[in-house]
């Protein structure tokens, strides 16, 4: 059986297959805006403009100005640079103005934000407003919204500024009505204070809500008032006082302020028999008071109808009461008030001391007005006077305060100055004390120094110019014989002046008081004791007594110490050659040696005494220490002298130096005989001294000749020729006059002292020669040798110009030996050593080159430093 597959759903048979028909898609409906219309949220054109302005850039003007400036710069680049800068100034001014304006706006906005967020220090600054929340109550809820915590200070100020709270408490029947009025007035009084549009919208909403909420309460209060008025009108006729009292009680309660109560309290004791009711006060003072209340209520249209009805009723009752009682009580009340005012004015006038005016009695309104106006005028006048007086007092007080400030500043300045003066005074006193202490110390040290120094008379007498010239001529005439300088100081006994003390710094010769160097101490320890016997004390005496000296030595010591030094010529350089020691051992005649020694002693005394005067001129600050043997320079003048044409010798001219011839030139004619006797006595005393000195000199010479035999040289003839050239010539110059005799005696005493000093120095040199080595008897560690075996010794001799001596001059061998031996000692002293050439030269301080030939003719001796 065969199975055939057949379409199950298809028609049987060979029928045609049918096609499905597609359904059309449902058309989508448009948006239905009828339910929620969103076009109300679309911004209006005004909002769009406002938003557009809000989002504009604030720097638009600045950008515009910058663009203009760039354009101007481009324009200026194209144009010449000499164009005016007016446009640039305009742009700078615009920029300054605009920037200041924008900065001011920013500052104002910032300050506004700060003020809104700031919390005021006082109650009303910034003003605080009472907020009224917009709360929607539930439909079935009778509870009011939650209470708002109000500021009590602001609330009390607002209540007092609008209406008196005591008046509200005194209301009996119309309390609710008064509260309603107070609320309405409170809300109305706050309206003008809100100036912004947002606050206006909020107040409108609040009033609308308040109207809806309180409409029932207001209607109820209004019906109660109408019922009471109707009941009172039924009981009494319209003109009865009860209706007036009932209507006026409310007005009196509303207007019973503190001022009215004070006036009423002042009138009650005077009119205790006739008490004044509050209704009269309200009639007199507040007859037209309801009109401002009505004008306040008319500000809002929502409350207009109810307020009109209520105020019309009140005003009608008030006017009816005024018409009834104005004729009875108004004049009495005014009289009492005027009397009270006048009484107060009289008391014020008495209190201030002004003239008291009597009461002006007047009947009717005319007298009342006159008294009131006069009282007001007086009050105003008194007020002006008090104000003027107050201003004067204020000005006076300001002046006094200014004066007080000035006085305080002066007091402060004086106090500071006094303190400064005190400090300065203390500092000055401290410096004075210190200065006194130092001065005392200096005085003490000066006193000790003066006590330790010898007494020296440094006063020198100077003769007149003609006398100096005459003495110079006399000296020039005696060229062949040696002449002693006339400027030799006289002994102390020949002068009538007082002795003058000099400190150590002003002594003619620097006296060495310090300890000797170690080398000299070692040398002195090897010498015999008889060499250091006391002779002439050129240093201050160290012994406790003068018993160790002989009388002659004591006289000689005092004479040497008290003699001032005369002035001598400038620097002399003595250059000596080193000689062999074989010539020193040859014998020499004692007479020739004495003559040469006298010449050297005079030169040494002359040089040493004149070196001290050089310290005063401060030309050569070199000192000769007398504690060591000085350098001797032989002063000799042979008979034969070279002519000035062949050799230019510089000899000193003593006529330029001041001569001291004695006291005889300064005596008057009246006392001539007395002074001459004194001079003769002095001459005799000097003669005795010279004889004693010569005797002592002969003894010392004989003893010194025994020790000095090894030092003599075989040049007796030269010195023998010098002896008759020196001393006989001196003896031939004895003048006959008194002054010349005094000078001659003075010269002889000086020569004797010089010889004595020379012999003492020779004894010391002999001891040094015997104890020294055979190669160099006295060898100084400070000698300066030249290449040729010569040494240079520089001696300061101020005031003399000298050169090399003439070729005919003969040099004393003993003087040469003495100068060579003493060179080592001078090298240890203050005289400088200078290694120069072998030839001797003299360097004068004040050269006189133009007078060379004249000086060579007039000179009487020459400084000879040549050694054979």
Swiss-Prot record:
GO terms for biological process: cell division; metaphase chromosome alignment; mitotic spindle assembly; regulation of centriole replication. Interacts with CEP120. Residues 129-154, 172-201, 229-250, 291-326, 630-664, 702-722, 805-868 are annotated as: Disordered. Residues 315-326, 634-649, 812-831 have a biased composition (Low complexity). It comes from the Eukaryota. The modification Phosphoserine is found at residues 240, 655, 772-773, 776, 831. Keywords: Cell cycle, Cell division, Coiled coil, Cytoplasm, Cytoskeleton, Mitosis, Phosphoprotein. InterPro entries: SPICE1. The modification Phosphothreonine is found at residue 236. It comes from Rattus norvegicus (Rat). Signal peptide: none annotated. This is Spindle and centriole-associated protein 1. The keyword Cytoplasm applies. Regulator required for centriole duplication, for proper bipolar spindle formation and chromosome congression in mitosis. It is found in: Cytoplasm, Cytoskeleton, Microtubule organizing center, Centrosome, Centriole; Cytoplasm, Cytoskeleton, Spindle. Residues 190-200, 229-245 have a biased composition (Polar residues).
């Amino acid at each position: 059986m065969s199975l055939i597959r057949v379409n199950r759903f298809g028609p049987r048979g060979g029928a045609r297959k049918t096609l499905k028909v597609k359904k059309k898609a449902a058309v989508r409906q448009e948006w239905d805006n009828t339910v929620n219309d969103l076009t109300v949220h679309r911004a209006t054109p005004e909002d769009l403009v406002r938003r557009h302005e809000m989002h504009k850039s604030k720097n638009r003007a600045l950008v515009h100005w910058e663009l203009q400036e760039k354009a101007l710069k481009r324009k200026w680049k194209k144009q010449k640079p000499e164009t005016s800068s007016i446009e640039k100034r305009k742009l700078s001014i615009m920029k300054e103005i605009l920037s200041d304006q924008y900065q001011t706006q920013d500052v104002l906005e910032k300050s506004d934000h700060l003020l809104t967020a700031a919390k005021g220090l006082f109650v009303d600054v910034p003003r605080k407003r009472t907020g009224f929340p917009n709360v929607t109550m539930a439909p079935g809820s009778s509870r009011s919204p939650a209470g708002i915590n109000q500021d009590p200070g602001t609330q009390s100020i607002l209540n007092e500024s609008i209406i008196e709270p005591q008046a509200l408490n005194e209301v009996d029947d119309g309390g609710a009505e008064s509260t309603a009025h107070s609320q309405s007035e409170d809300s109305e009084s706050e309206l003008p204070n809100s100036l912004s549009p947002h606050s206006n919208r909020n107040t409108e909403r609040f009033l609308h809500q308040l109207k809806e909420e309180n409409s029932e309460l207001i209607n109820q209060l209004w019906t109660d008032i109408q019922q009471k008025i109707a009941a009172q009108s039924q009981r009494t006729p319209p003109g009865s006082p009860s209706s007036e009292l009932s209507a006026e009680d409310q007005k009196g309660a509303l207007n019973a302020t503190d001022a009215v109560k004070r006036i009423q309290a002042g009138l009650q004791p005077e009119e205790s028999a006739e008490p004044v009711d509050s209704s009269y006060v309200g009639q007199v003072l507040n007859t037209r008071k309801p009109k401002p209340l009505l004008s306040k209520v008319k500000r809002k249209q929502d409350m207009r109808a109810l307020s009109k009805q209520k105020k019309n009723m009140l005003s009608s009752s008030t006017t009816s009461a005024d018409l009834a009682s104005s004729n009875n009580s108004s004049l009495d009340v005014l009289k009492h008030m005027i009397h009270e005012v006048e009484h107060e004015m009289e008391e014020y006038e008495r209190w201030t001391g002004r003239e008291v005016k009597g009461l002006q009695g007047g009947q009717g309104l005319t007298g009342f007005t006159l008294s009131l106006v006069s009282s007001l005028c007086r009050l105003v006048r008194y007020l002006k006077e008090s104000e003027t007086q107050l201003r004067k007092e204020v000005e006076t007080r300001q002046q006094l305060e200014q004066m007080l400030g000035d006085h305080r500043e002066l007091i402060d300045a004086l106090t500071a100055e006094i303190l400064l003066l005190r400090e300065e005074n203390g500092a000055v006193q401290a410096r004075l004390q210190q200065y006194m202490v130092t001065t005392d110390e200096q005085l003490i040290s000066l006193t000790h120094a003066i006590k330790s120094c010898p007494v020296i008379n440094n006063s020198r007498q100077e003769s007149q110019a003609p006398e100096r010239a005459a003495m110079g001529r006399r000296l020039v005439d005696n060229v062949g014989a040696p002449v002693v300088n006339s400027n030799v100081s006289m002994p102390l006994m020949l002068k009538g002046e007082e002795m003058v003390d000099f400190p150590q710094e002003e002594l003619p010769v620097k006296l060495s008081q310090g300890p000797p160097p170690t080398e000299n101490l070692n040398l002195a320890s090897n010498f015999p004791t008889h060499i250091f016997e006391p002779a002439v004390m050129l240093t201050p005496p160290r012994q406790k007594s003068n018993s160790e000296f002989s009388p002659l030595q004591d006289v000689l010591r005092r004479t040497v110490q008290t003699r001032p030094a005369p002035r001598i010529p400038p620097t002399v350089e003595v250059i000596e050659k080193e000689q062999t020691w074989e010539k020193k051992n040859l014998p020499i005649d004692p007479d020739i040696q004495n003559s040469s020694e006298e010449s050297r002693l005079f030169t040494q005394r002359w040089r040493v005494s004149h070196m001290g005067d050089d310290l005063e001129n401060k030309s050569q600050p070199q000192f000769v220490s007398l504690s060591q043997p000085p350098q001797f320079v032989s002063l000799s003048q042979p008979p034969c002298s070279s002519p000035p044409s062949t050799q230019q010798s510089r000899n000193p001219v003593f006529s330029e130096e001041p001569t001291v011839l004695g006291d005889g030139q300064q005596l008057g004619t009246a006392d001539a005989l007395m002074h001459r006797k004194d001079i003769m006595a002095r001459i005799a005393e000097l003669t005795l001294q010279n004889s004693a000195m010569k005797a002592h000199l002969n003894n010392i010479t004989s003893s010194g000749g025994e020790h000095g035999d090894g030092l003599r040289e075989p040049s007796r003839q030269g010195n023998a020729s010098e002896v008759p050239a020196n001393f006989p010539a001196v003896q031939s110059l004895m003048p006959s006059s008194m002054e010349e005799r005094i000078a001659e005696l003075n010269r002889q005493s000086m020569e004797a002292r010089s010889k004595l000093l020379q012999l003492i120095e020779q004894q010391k040199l002999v001891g040094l020669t015997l104890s020294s080595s055979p190669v160099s008897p006295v060898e100084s560690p400070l000698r300066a040798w030249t290449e040729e075996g010569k040494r240079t010794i520089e001696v300061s001799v101020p005031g003399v110009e000298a050169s090399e001596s003439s070729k005919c001059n003969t040099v004393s061998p003993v003087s040469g030996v003495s100068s060579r031996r003493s060179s080592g000692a001078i090298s240890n002293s203050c005289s400088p050593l200078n290694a120069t050439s072998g030839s001797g030269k003299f360097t004068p301080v004040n050269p006189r080159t133009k007078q060379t030939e004249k000086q060579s003719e007039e000179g009487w001796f020459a400084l000879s430093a040549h050694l054979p």
